[in-house]
Amino acid sequence: MRLTNAFFANHAEVVDDMLNVTGGCWTSTTVADGATAFATRCVIFCEVSRQDRGKQFGLHIDAAGPSGQQWTPARSSYFTVPSRIAFMVTPPIALPIEPSGGLHSYTVRLEDHDERITLPLHVQVVAGSAFPSR
């Protein structure tokens, strides 16, 4: 199995083996003052061979904030490849941010594999916002 691309989305799901996305391909997000995480789904594109079917893989998302703070991993999940797939969608997840916002970097990787997909994300903090702190 090999990762080829990834992006954040407000909502993503698989319907009839097709990807349905709302609000995808973020380059920035806005959070309320004091937030330490943001909610998202991550869509991950991959190449799967016959040999990968039935095998278990570990998917990790690492995070780094603008001050150098790192969360490795920030999120991990394990899954078994059921069949030939071209993409995966995470369930709703919360990924960490530094409370002051700024340019963060999220890296999607498979355990014991070299491929990495890096997703830069500018986090804007809004004081007194109606956004819930997640």
Tell me the role of every PLM-derived stretch.
Residues 2-134:
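Contiguous segments within soluble domain cores/interaction surfaces
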